[in-house]
Amino acid sequence: DRAGRIAAVGFSYRRLPAVAQLRDAVRDGAIGTPYFARAHFFSDYALDPSTPMAWRFDREASGGGTILDMATHTIDVLEHVLGDVREVLACTLDTTIARRPGEDGQTHEVTNDDTALISLRFAGGALASILSSRVGAGCPIELGLEVFGSAGHVRYAFNRPNEWILYQKDLGEPGADA
């Protein structure tokens, strides 16, 4: 509102059937009380320093780098599973590739982040750490999520979109559910 701009994101990852099943398992108590989570979203689309300067690398045009382009999706999946974020505990942003070539033959300063490291606390008390980067070598697109609780944990990886893993301490071995 203050900037006079509207931002909207199509949060498509929460609609994946495996993510919906994982969410239901957590909310139904399959892992007990959620204590903490870790999530990541990596891509390598900005890894090459010769990638031309574009709106994605300009804070004024984009509003932010990986934190708005990618981490928003990770935060949404975590909120979908754990409920609302109550507090941002820490956020560190880093620009790995500081300059990019422009169409004018000059190099231009990248004014937003390539990597974001975020710590959150959710309304239910669970903590989460998120690492998001658009310079993740060898990762065309990779989103992952783990939630640990008093009685087990769940795990999801986007590169296996129809699977998620549930480990329950009373049962021992991890098992996959689809």
Spans of model-derived segments:
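Intrinsic-disorder/low-complexity coil detector
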Residues: D48-T51, C139, E173
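Predominantly a Rossmann-like dinucleotide-binding segment in NAD(P)-dependent oxidoreductases
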Residues: R5-A8, Y13-E109
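C-terminal helix-rich "cap/oligomerization" subdomain common to oxidoreductases
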Residues: R2, A157, L171-G172
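Glycine-rich phosphate/pyrophosphate-binding loop
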Residues: P174-A178
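Contiguous beta-strand/loop segments that form the cofactor/metal-binding neighborhood of enzyme cores
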Residues: D76-Q168
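A short helix->loop->beta-strand "cap" motif at the edges of active sites that frequently abuts
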Residues: A3-R5, A126-L127
